């Protein structure tokens, strides 16, 4: 999935909250949010700014998961599926350029709802597709404040 950056320190010592500081240059064993927008970009000058705004929408959700005490493995899995969701949203804005002008929150809410996320063509199997949809539903509930993560 996304590019993973490993820390030079022992990953077992990193708390989930510390992992979320990758965007502040501290590194982590699985998250490096600053590189996500670039990894999604088919057209860097157009896609990176949109991608960066999407990442900013993901950060409070990931932070809430970390604060709720979710395990590193669960955080990593959620992050992987969020990375996939971001890629699908960017693919969509390349097909519908007018959507590039939408605020990131609105753009995301056009792609996720109480049933899950957009079609994800890179799912290896039904289990991955179901897990992806579960994360999208959880993000939707978080963004619409219907439920905490």
Q: What are these model-derived regions, one by one?
A:
Residues 1-149:
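Charge-rich, intrinsically disordered N-terminal extensions
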